[in-house]
Amino acid sequence: MLYQLSPSDLRRFYDDGYLIIEDLFSREEVEEMAEAAERIRALGREIAAALPADEEAGERKAEHGGSQFVFGGIDRSLGSTRLLRVVWAGGCEPSFLACGRDARLTAIVGQLLGSSTAVQLLNQLHAKYPNDGLEFEPHQDSEHRRYGTPEWCDVDGRGSYVQTVVAIDDTTPENGPLIFFPGSGRQGHLDPATVRNDYRDRPGIPALLEAGSAAFFGPYVVHRSAENRGAAPRRIAINGFALPGANSRSYFGAGTGVPVELFQPS
């Protein structure tokens, strides 16, 4: 059964910039992704072993099995090159793509976008392990969608994009949760440097998702995530969807976007 958003859900999404839906997937379903995430981590370690551990090298990318492994900095818990994210994670582990195409997820995206169709741009695994040092500064996703360049057009005037996060693990205040700044997106796209400076020291609201729960957010809400200082991993499956006509940038695995019927089973 597909989740039907209420008028208050829609208002919350556009006023606060994000929406939390609890228990969208079962723990058994996300356990499959947890096992896949550990296989991906093992692959990442093999690839990282061939890379020099260089704090100043910037991002380095390697393709394997239809996925792109992105490395950068040093994993302080291992002393080796750190895996930042896996792009198009469903290439080497299909359970990630199955999650991103599941109608329980995409139907909510469709209700938020007000559209039965979209193009999928992102299918990623982000994982933080205890004391690996990985954190993300305050930012808007509109920066990464290339807002203000010919590669992006806000066709509906409300962002034209929804990003989804499915928690693979229970999120705690200690293990590096997403932190949102409600209402921060009402002004639309902001200067990235200003966002980092203005929001770096603000507390924000942590999204303490239980495994199987999901966050949905637009491209303008400011958010960040802290370092994992807990004892357990914090792994999330990310999928991003744009309205047709919004994006012209090419993404690994998706090109300019894979067409998706949002209300139909994949």
Spell out what each predicted region is.
Residues I20-I21, A118-L122, P177-F180, F216:
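A structural signal for short, well-ordered beta-strand segments and their strand-loop junctions
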Residues S26, P94-R101, G157, D201, ...:
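Aromatic-acidic/polar surface patches that form glycan- and anion
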Residues A107-I108, D132-P206, N247-A254:
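Catalytic core of non-heme Fe(II) oxygenases with the double-stranded beta-helix
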Residues L122-L125, T164-V166, A237-F241:
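A structural signal for short, well-ordered beta-strand segments
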